[in-house]
Amino acid sequence: FIYFFLLLIFGSINNINFNKKELNKIKKINIIGLNDNDKKIILQNLQSIKFNNIFLIDYKDLNEILNSNEFIESHEIFKKYPSTLDIKIKKTKLLAKINRDGKLLFIGSNGKFLKNEKSNFQLPFIFGNPEVKDFLKLKSIIDESNILYEDVKNFYFFPSKRWDLELT
């Protein structure tokens, strides 16, 4: 009986101290595969999960935050115990430029529109109003053919879903 009484007393005191400790809290998030500016954007978006328990991470919310960024093609999440989260990100490749509603946008290999990024390399321009999936289908056909994608100067899309290519 005395052992049970001592267990209750010391267990209660230790539980009070145990609750004050920040065990298993995420203290550091490492992002691999992006430049510093893109890392800052992702880290700002991830602030809500930074101090959560590493064992209780809601992957649905984490994936939703990461997938909402148009420049991310894919990502992998690794837990480094006791308090670090590593996120390996593959950045999307810019495939073409398109004018949508008077704005110059880029189409990424992830099928999303990206806002005007400062790019120093030449990309083909798409004239017309295609669906992104139609363009990605054409891109895969070009990749399987003898035509080099780098040789394409412009794409012309017609309402009949016909594509014309202008080569350099």
Where are these regions (language model features)?
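Hydrophobic membrane-insertion alpha-helices, especially the h-region
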Residues: F1-N14
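Extracytoplasmic segments of membrane-associated envelope/inner-membrane machinery
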Residues: L85-P159
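Terminal hydrophobic membrane-targeting helix
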Residues: S12-K118
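A generic secondary-structure signal marking the coil-to-beta-strand transition
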Residues: K27, Q122, K161-W163
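Short, intrinsically disordered, charge-balanced linker/junction segments flanking boundaries
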Residues: D164-T168
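Extreme N-terminal "leader" segments
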Residues: F1, K21-L23, F157
